Amino acid sequence: MASNNVAQFAAELKMPAGVLLEQLQAAGVQKASEDDALSETDKARLLDHLRKSHGATDGDKRKITLTRKHTSEIKQSDATGKARTIQVEVRKKRTFVKRDDVAEGAEQGQAQVAEADDDAELKRREEEARREAELLEQQAQELLERQERLEREEAERRAREEAAEAERRRAEEEAAAKRAAAEAAAAQQAAAQQAAEAKQEAPGAQSAQEEARAAAERAAQREAAKKAEDAAREAADKARAEQEEIRKRREAAEAEARAIREMMNTPRKAVVKAVEPPKPVEAPKPAEAKGTLHKPAKPAGAGVQARPAVKKPAGATPATTQAPAAGAGDRNKKPGGGKGGWQDDAAKRRGIKTRGDSSGGVDRGWRGGPKGRGRHQDSASTFQAPTEPIVREVHVPETISVADLAHKMSIKASEVIKVMMKMGQMVTINQVLDQETAMIVVEELGHRAVAAKLDDPEALLVEGETSSDAEQLPRPPVVTVMGHVDHGKTSLLDHIRRAKVAAGEAGGITQHIGAYHVETPRGVITFLDTPGHEAFTAMRARGAKATDIVVLVVAADDGVMPQTKEAIAHAKAGGVPIVVAINKIDKPEANPDRVKQELVAEGVVPEEYGGDSPFVPVSAKTGAGIDDLLENVLLQAEVLELKAPVEAPAKGIVIEAKLDKGKGPVATILVQSGTLNRGDIVLAGSAYGRVRAMLDENGKPTKEAGPSIPVEIQGLSEVPGAGEEVIVLPDERKAREIALFRQGKFRDVKLAKQQAAKLESMLEQMGEGEVQNLPLIIKADVQGSQEALVQSLLKLSTDEVRVQIVHSAVGGISENDVNLATASKAVIIGFNTRADAQARKLAEANGIDIRYYNIIYDAVDEVKAAMSGMLAPEKREVITGMVEVRQVFKVPKIGTVAGCMVTDGIVKRSSSVRVLRNNVVIFTGELESLKRFKDDVKEVKQGFECGMSVKNFNDIVEGDQFEVFEVTEVARTL
């Protein structure tokens, strides 16, 4: 829905309308209320304003770097006088910075906006510019007034201070003059006294008195002049200090005004300037004599790394910071006016900086250290052992590889392997350990092991499952029809649904689990039809898990059978009520009373006997008793008070899953609570995806499915496992994360189980000798059939012949399956699937046997026959005759020959023989020769004499008996 006003746009952005109005006004879009119309231009201006306020800039390149390389050759004589040619490569790099990008971009943007906007937009912008100019002018005027006020106040204060200072100086001068006059009067008085005394003493003393008076006057004048000079100096210092303070205040005010103007003119974005680390001060290089070949001596302390430069104070001027840099640049210049020789290249090579070396390559090498320090005493590379061991807390998941476990403990994987070898287990670096073993290894290495499930997204899924506030409404019951094979379950459902499903099933037996919902006058019922064959145990267990009521179908002419007992066990395990339907009552041999007695023996007691299970006689053929059965089912549902939320995310269970060649993974699910809509994101085990299509049991598209409704969905990432829980999530990213986690967890657990079973299987094979394997690849149409067929074939394994399932999956037979069969020498079994054209050609070329079946009986019987052919044949002995020794002859180079009489049966040349003496077997072997007179014969019959010799046996005496027998091989069966 397009947003036409401010309120709709705020609802679309999921934010308050008041906040949106403030942002629009900040962007210059004048909107007064939530009902004002909003155009695309207004939205574009708001977006541009938000981008600028968050610091978004264009990513165009602003500088170009050009690198030039020039190669030349110079000739230099070495110490021996030979001329050497040296390649000199000069590289120059120049960077051009485009500084007017911002201005050009602003001009282009203004030009484009000016062309695109209408007259009203131009007037509005002019008004905004005028207001901004007035605001800036007002701020500048206020700043000027503030400066003038400060200057006026400063001038008045300075005038007051100057007047006070002048008054103080005048008072000091008057006091000094008074003191000088007093001193002069005292001096005159003293001089007068001295003159009087001098007159009395000598007439020549008058001249001395005058000189003393003149000296006193000069001293007084010097004292007064010195005091006046000190006062003038103090006044000048005060005036300079006041002027400096006024100048600083003026500069601060100007800086503040400049900052305000920049803030008003620049967009609101903050660019944090990266703080450059202080560069270490390089020691000055000694001047090298040009043309010298020897290595100049190092000055004292050259090997010591220079201390880092002291940080500059905040108020340092640029002049003070640039002077040392300029000096350093002068010191780093090459001698000889910048023309470098080959000795400069050697110095560069010596000064190359390596990783971890901050000294610029100085003193590198095992001879480079200062005097008194060896090559192993370098402080930069000396290893210091930790003072105490570090004990880490290691979180051990359910499965972890040796490499990951070592990484968690911050040690090498070889250390973990050593510990495992000491514990008697040989492991590799990629081997997966179970949680218990890994925790033992962690404790053995001195760390603390904690069993934890880290980064488990399923924990977040469980935490997110809160009690739904949706209203609990009545839902239809889910009824599972169970019973023995051929007892009429599907036929009963066909009569209820007015359909004919049983006629279309191979062999007349159900091999898939089916889900249907039927609308009756009293309400809706959802039926699950489960297979009755013994191979489909897991499928029946899934049906009992997802059901509310079990309808147990028992044939009146057959009674309780093994799968009937199993269905009763499934229903009791799930705590599900049972409604017994005694089917085929229209047959003459039907005996419902016998069925009731057999069911009572299994713990299912009818209501007429005081139990809680209703028994309903029905006939799927004539339809008798169907209405009573449905009424009993709905009555049980009313007693259970089945309720589920409707307006909530859907939850359910996978009834069946398959891989369709055109549709991809398809899953039949039963919604248990909530409503499943087309487009929802679902998670089913390790599969996830968006519901692209949703079909009901009749193959018709539907948009939603409520509680207890079975639907077929498409759009999953892979075929989910039958029986997996289905849940609707709001975020596809979260669904993918949980699905990938489940896949990895399943793979790790599977690898751990395989690793644990390797040794056991190896010991079993060593104890049992050679075991024949029948490798099979199974492809089925749906998940349940594939699971049932695999379990049925694995049950055929014996101690001598084992069924090895190389691969089993859902879908058609592809080239990958044929290639896998070629590598593993396996037979491919397709259950209700076929191979495509490429797979058939590849199978014919490689001689791979592909067998197709649509009835599980046939597949099991043929695999059983193939296994029988692989059994070692049974050897049986058949006694063909008895011979009595009459005379013994010693023949040179031949040995002992017995003259015999055939007393019973027949003696053949290829037969084996036992030598009996006093009816005790003393030797078993083969005949070496059989003669009659001097001729070799093939056989001698009863009543004839013959000569016989036994291979490798000469201890024959008269009276011995030879028992002649043959060994025949008899084929065995399973």
Curated annotation (Swiss-Prot):
Domain tr-type G, first and last residues per copy: 474-643
Residue ranges under compositional bias (Low complexity)? 105-114, 182-197, 313-329
The segment annotated G4 runs over 583-586
> Which residue stretches belong to region G2?
508-512
* Residues covered by region (G3): 529-532
By its UniProt entry, which Pfam families does this protein fall under? EF-G_D2, GTP_EFTU, GTP_EFTU_D2, IF-2, IF2_assoc, IF2_N
Q: Where does GTP bind?
A: 483-490, 529-533, 583-586
Cystine connections = none
The cross-references to Gene3D superfamilies, in alphabetical order and at most eight, read: P-loop containing nucleotide triphosphate hydrolases (3.40.50.300), Putative DNA-binding domain, N-terminal subdomain of bacterial translation initiation factor IF2 (3.30.56.50), Translation factors (2.40.30.10), Translation initiation factor IF- 2, domain 3 (3.40.50.10050)
Instruction: List every stretch annotated G1.
Output: 483-490
Q: Enumerate the subcellular locations listed in this protein's record, separating them with semicolons.
A: Cytoplasm
Segments of this protein annotated with the region Disordered: 67-86, 101-133, 146-385
Q: Does the keyword Cytoplasm apply?
A: yes
Region G5: start and end of each range?
A: 619-621
One Gene Ontology cellular component? cytosol
Q: Which UniProt key words apply to this protein?
A: Cytoplasm, GTP-binding, Initiation factor, Nucleotide-binding, Protein biosynthesis
- PANTHER family the UniProt entry points to: TR-TYPE G DOMAIN-CONTAINING PROTEIN, TRANSLATION INITIATION FACTOR IF-2-RELATED
What does the sequence similarity comment in the record state about its family? Belongs to the TRAFAC class translation factor GTPase superfamily. Classic translation factor GTPase family. IF-2 subfamily.
Q: What does this protein do?
A: One of the essential components for the initiation of protein synthesis. Protects formylmethionyl-tRNA from spontaneous hydrolysis and promotes its binding to the 30S ribosomal subunits. Also involved in the hydrolysis of GTP during the formation of the 70S ribosomal complex.
Q: What protein is this chain from? A: Translation initiation factor IF-2
Gene encoding this polypeptide?
infB
